[in-house]
């Protein structure tokens, strides 16, 4: 939920107008809108490149994942990992656009906990996968844009580590 929605719902629940501080938060949200849109555009336009680079880096760091018995061993399992990479990159993009980590939590982490536990996927490996996704993504952004985007990746990584 964006800051705008949060402010409106809270003010309405309390039967009042938004406070000066709340209006400043909305102003700040709008001021960063162009930057958030630019970041989202780069991430979405570069999805294939990001996923390819991140997966290559992950397989180099963790060859056991693609070795016999590994969770990404075989064409089908590897394709599922790449699909998940794209899904997580999309979640990061949602968070950046919203200026809020809530979409990552509600859409991504809550469902991931259940899914990966039921499939027996080791979550430390998923955290490492998201780290490589972060590295590949931030390399395509300006320094200022990378600074804005990084906390969304970090939130997802931390969520994977604490599941």
From Swiss-Prot:
UniProt-listed Gene3D superfamilies: Phycocyanins
Modified residues (N4-methylasparagine): 71
Subcellular location: Cellular thylakoid membrane
The entry's keywords: Antenna complex, Bile pigment, Chromophore, Electron transport, Membrane, Methylation, Photosynthesis, Phycobilisome, Thylakoid, Transport
Main location: membrane
Family note: Belongs to the phycobiliprotein family.
Subunit structure: Heterodimer of an alpha and a beta chain.
Protein name: Allophycocyanin alpha-B chain
Species this chain originates from: Synechococcus sp. (strain ATCC 27144 / PCC 6301 / SAUG 1402/1)
Organism phylogeny: Bacteria, Bacillati, Cyanobacteriota, Cyanophyceae, Synechococcales
């Amino acid at each position: 939920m964006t800051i705008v929605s949060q402010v409106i719902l809270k003010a309405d629940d309390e039967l009042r107008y938004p406070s000066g501080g709340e209006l400043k938060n909305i102003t700040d949200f709008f001021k960063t809108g162009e930057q958030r849109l630019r970041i989202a555009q780069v991430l979405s336009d570069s999805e294939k490149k990001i996923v390819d680079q991140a997966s290559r880096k992950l397989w180099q760091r963790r060859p056991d994942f693609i070795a016999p018995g590994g969770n990404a061993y075989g064409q089908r399992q590897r394709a599922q990992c790449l699909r998940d990479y794209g899904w997580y990159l999309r979640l990061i993009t949602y968070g950046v656009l919203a200026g809020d980590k809530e979409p990552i939590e509600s859409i991504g982490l809550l469902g991931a906990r259940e899914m990966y536990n039921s499939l027996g996927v080791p979550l430390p490996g998923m955290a490492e996968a998201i780290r490589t996704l972060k590295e590949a993504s931030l390399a395509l952004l300006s320094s200022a844009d990378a600074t804005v985007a990084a906390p969304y990746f970090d939130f997802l990584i931390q969520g994977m580590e604490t599941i």
